[in-house]
Structures are given as C-alpha cells and as structure tokens.
Amino acid sequence: MIREKLKVSTQTLQWKCVESRVDSKRLYYGRFILSPLMKGQADTIGITMRRILLGEIEGTCITRAKSEKIPHEYSTIVGIQESIHEILMNLKEIVLRSNLYGTREASICFKGPGYVTAQDIILPSVEVIDNTQHIANLTEPINLCIELQIERKRGYRIKTLNNIQDGSYTIDAVFMPVRNANHSIHSYVNGNQKQEILFLEIWTNGSLTPKEALYEASRNLIDLFIPFLHAEEENLNFENNQHKMTLPLFTFHDHDRFVKDKLRKNQKEITLKSIFIDQLELPPRIYNCLKKSNIHTVLELLNKSQEDLMKIEHFRVEDLKFILNILQIENHFV
C-alpha cells in the first residue's frame, strides 16, 4: 500500500494539481484535489464533474470522407495496402484540436509510393495532435485524393447510411477529448469536524490537457446554474389561495450589501471570474477574437484597456462599441 503525504488547506476551499504527466502524444494524465469539503460534498462534486467531463466537453473529429470511384466501403484499391474500411477506421482515430464552429473541409492528396500519415492532411485552422498517426500505405505510384469533413461537437455520433452514389462515407465520431475520469474520497478529522478531500483523476486524448478539461467542465457547469441566479420573481400560492408570498430575487448586489466593506472588492472579482464571455451572447467573430486572445471571463475583459482590445487581430472599432454597449446593459455584473 502506497502512502502519500499531501499538504491541503484546512480553512479555505482550494484545489491544486498533485500529479501531471504525458504518457504519449494522445494520452495525458492529471490528478487534482479539492479540500476541505464537508461530509457528502466530495461525492456530489465528484459524480457531477465526472459526468460533465465525459459528456459535456466539445471535441473535433473527422466525420466524413469522400473519394471518387469507390464502389463500397469494404472494397480495395490496387496499390493501396489497406481496404477503404481500414482507411476510414484510421481517419476516425486522428486526434484534432480546434476552436472552429460548424463544419470545415479538409483534404488529403498524396502520390505514392509511401506512407500516408496525419501530417499529410491539409487542415485549415485545425491542429493535428499526432502527425505520425497512420492512414494508409501506398505500394505503387498512384494518387490518393480524399475530401474530408471536420466538425466540433460533444458526445459521440454513430454513422448513418453511407451515400454510395457520390463516394461519400460517414465516420463514427467520438467528440469526447476526455478518455476517462475517476474520483475518490479521503475522510479526515479536523478538530471536532469530519471533513473530506476529493481526488479527481482525468485522462485526455491530448487535444486538451487535464487542467484545460477541468476548466472547461467547471465553466460548463457554471453556465448550467447561472439561470437560477437570475430567475424572475414568482408568486407561490398556497392551497387555500389566501396567503401569497413573493420570493426575493437574489442578486450579487444584494449579497454585497451584507458583507463588510473591505471584502466587497474581492467579492466582486470572484463574481466576475465566474461570468464567462459565452454568456454575453457576442457575435461569433467577436467571440472568437476574444477567445484567441485568452479572454474567457468578464473580469479578464474588463482588465483590458480599449487600446489592448484594438490590438487584437481582426478586431474593429465597431466591435469595441458593441462590447461597451453589452457591458453597459449588463451593468449588474460590473
């Protein structure tokens, strides 16, 4: 039995990475801890995070391949060692990283003899994680030309019936960048109180690091709960319809009124850190510009001057005016 000594916070809730390694280009591992937690909280967070990590994080895959003069998926071509089916399976395994929206086109044009690998794919705005991934072996001086379709989604999608008429074949797509996630709980006694430490293990395919996956999962989870903080006031009617009560609307401003003055600035920053630019409903082009500049939250956006924003590639004066207008509308955040 292996024993580890870990220094954990006993007062303020904190998380940290206690182990990180790269087993291969397509296998990253990270182990994280979160503490201190009250009894029962670790299991709640662990189960929720595992479900989000495995099902809610987007990934990029090749979803369709097209090549002319192919009668069916299980046919072979003279001069190519693999069958068409084997080539499609190899394309399915290609790991990609991107921030694209919608569908993109890519292609392979290779003249044999030689080995076709992932580095031979012409991919606009998409990164291949492992250029050495094998696709096909051309044993004769022939041309192999394949048109590819690339998509970014979440979860997985089983291929539909192939359209044989135009030589187009759908590919089973696994969009999940997280290969696996596990959690475990360690209980300990702090004074007279029983507390817990949550251990979270994450394996990814290399398109995201475990830390990036944890960040994305946390952001997605926050987005799911944000509407509850801004729910409209509702009247609760009792069965006798004689007594009515209105639930007060919780806002960040209401909360700030009850904290000490010296904590207001910190509270405001914490709030802004939890509000992501995804929630501002920005046009895709502005959103992509901010993302490429590593601006993910409203706090990070407010920390940028107008001059900083105008230095962003493809960012225009009209975009700046639009953002300023959005922030003015959302003034309860700032």
UniProtKB/Swiss-Prot annotation:
UniProt main location, coarse: plastid
Domain notes: The N-terminal domain is essential for RNAP assembly and basal transcription, whereas the C-terminal domain is involved in interaction with transcriptional regulators and with upstream promoter elements.
GO annotation terms (biological process): DNA-templated transcription
InterPro entries linked: DNA-dir_RNA_pol_insert, DNA-dir_RNA_pol_RpoA/D/Rpb3, DNA-dir_RpoA, RBP11-like, RNAP_asu_C, RNApol_insert_sf
GO cellular component: chloroplast; DNA-directed RNA polymerase complex; mitochondrion
Protein name: DNA-directed RNA polymerase subunit alpha
Keyword Nucleotidyltransferase among record annotations: yes
EC number per UniProt: 2.7.7.6
Keyword presence, Transcription: yes
Coiled-coil ranges per UniProt: none
Source organism (scientific name): Pisum sativum (Garden pea)
Keywords: Chloroplast, DNA-directed RNA polymerase, Nucleotidyltransferase, Plastid, Transcription, Transferase
Assembly notes: In plastids the minimal PEP RNA polymerase catalytic core is composed of four subunits: alpha, beta, beta', and beta''. When a (nuclear-encoded) sigma factor is associated with the core the holoenzyme is formed, which can initiate transcription.
